[in-house]
Amino acid sequence: EIKQKTWEKRTAVKQEASFKLKVAEEDKDLESMLKFAARTAILTRDMKEDAQAVITALGLPIVQAPSEGEAQTAHMVKNGDAYASVSQDYDNLIFGCPVLVRNLSIEGRRKKTGTLAFQKVNPEVIMLQDVLTNLKLDVEQLIVLAILVGTDYNPGGVKGIGPKTGLKLLKEHGHDFEAIFTK
């Protein structure tokens, strides 16, 4: 149900971008056309099949996750079937993935959100145990922190609670999560 709402929201964003793209085309506003065209991009079945064919031709395995890709890759890394999960967000850590690689890019850059500009990025290896040690949390508390500040599945998190406040609440209440959410 939560994932369905996420898909619906993404579809609505694409539809709005499609409308704005048409307006930009009518106005001959090239910058807006580029911006909104990028937001209307979709991954087609043919594109997926072509990518899978290339991966198979390279002799690499393809794993189709039964549910969430982040959960699948976290499971594979925990079982030693892969070294790390590669993602731009931190959701893999919430699933207990021991090693996460961010900013893995051939060109060493990625698009800045909401702009046509790019920023230089370097690959970053994040070890779950280091995150937990630095924050003085366990995985269960990290999950609660993610719920408080927001994830892909609850964008924005709990209104008025950012990372600092969320961490402070966890330090104050430990594992008394009911106290955190009723406060």
Question: What function would you assign to each model-found segment?
Answer:
Residues E1-E68, Q72-N79, P98-L100, I106:
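Noncatalytic, basic helical substrate-engagement surface that gates or grips nucleic-acid strands
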Residues Q64, F95-G96, L104, T113, ...:
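Intrinsically disordered, low-complexity regions enriched in proline, serine, glycine
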Residues P98-N134:
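Acidic, PIN/NYN-like endoribonuclease modules and their adjacent C-terminal/linker elements
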Residues Q119-K183:
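Non-catalytic nucleic-acid-binding/docking modules located in mid-to-C-terminal regions
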Residues L93-F95, G166:
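General alpha-helical segment detector with a strong preference for membrane-spanning helices
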